[in-house]
Amino acid sequence: MKFLFSVILVIISFLGISKIVNGQIACPSPFLYRATNDTVGDYDLGYQYINIGKPLPPQLSFLNNCLMPCQSSFFEQDSWNSFNKLVKQMGAVAFTCSAIIMIIYGPLMNRSFFKFDRHTITVFCFALSTFFIGVSDLMFATNDVDMVCPESHRYARQTDKTCATNGVLFQFGWLGSVMWFAFLSIDGFFRASGKKMNKIAFAIVLASIWILNIVLSFAPMGGDQYGAYFVGQVNCWILVKNWQYAFFWAELIVSLAIGFVGICLTIYSLIRKTSDGNTLKHVTPLILVFLLFCQYLYMIIFYGIINEKKDHYQNILAEQVGCIFNNALAKMKVPGIVYAGECTFNETITFSSQYAFLFFVRLLGIEIFAFYLFSKETLLLIKSSYIATMFGLGDKDAYDVELEETD
């Protein structure tokens, strides 16, 4: 962690920096001292202490009251700038891509939408979900870091401006994409095998997914769970890992299981129909579902590691800062302080793993666009759309005829 080397330079430049600066207790830059006896209450307000995690000599006891900066010291500022830039730029692209697919597959252009066409509605719902992720990213782009860091050393909480809204939008979009990915895999199997689904059954599935998504997105507000996490996310999201497991990761695990079954059944159906001239057109959606499966799998592995090792990562950072200051005070011959030897710098979260996580979440909206925009199905939807037929450029039955022939 290169950040810690900058701490060393600060210490050296100030000859070990005293804990008293102009009569005020000071912490090493970029940390900030906060006098408190209620660290738990402060956490609820958004303050994150470095938490040395072990008894300290009196001369160093002030370090337990040092606040972590927002955004956190797990990454250098250049790294955070890269993360923020990725979310802003890629989020805007994903928002636009999702909106285009929503328009084509939604009721504005899709004549089959209100006929409860299973496939087009499923694609629309997935695009709608990634659209909400894009909206949350645009909120971050508009408000910048102030949305997650209302103060230099305080992380946003649900009571802060825009954080609750951003958290709900992100959760709603991300969770929705997960559940509709699962159904997209089942839809692929139905299309590849030629099986049909009762429209009433599909209506029940449609309503159930959206109702469940709404409940799981708004319920965390009852526990004041939305806020800025000091690692993993750039947006506001669910703070406590047990709440994350209950309201997101459990649903993702179930969706991955369904997705895996759907992928296997689709492959099996395609193998059985290798002589069918329509087999190739089912391969592209299968590739999309497989890529989504891999991305969601990476997300759960990454966040699982983060959640399980969060306290460990904090302790590494805290111990390294404590070691540096201990040695600095020892060199100043402060009574009672013993030189602790060379301070080691252990890796916590790599830049590439964090970047990949943020990238994969934003890639969802771009993928649905890339895989469906130029498909034959999309071209038929455009040809049969209200707008195309209004100007005499299309055939209102084009998509339905294709559907009858192949589905």
UniProtKB/Swiss-Prot annotation:
It is found in: Membrane. Residues 24-89, 142-169, 221-246, 307-354 are extracellular. The chain crosses the membrane at residues 90-110, 121-141, 170-190, 200-220, 247-267, 286-306, 355-375. It comes from the Eukaryota. GO terms for cellular component: membrane. Belongs to the G-protein coupled receptor Fz/Smo family. This is Frizzled/smoothened-like sans CRD protein J.
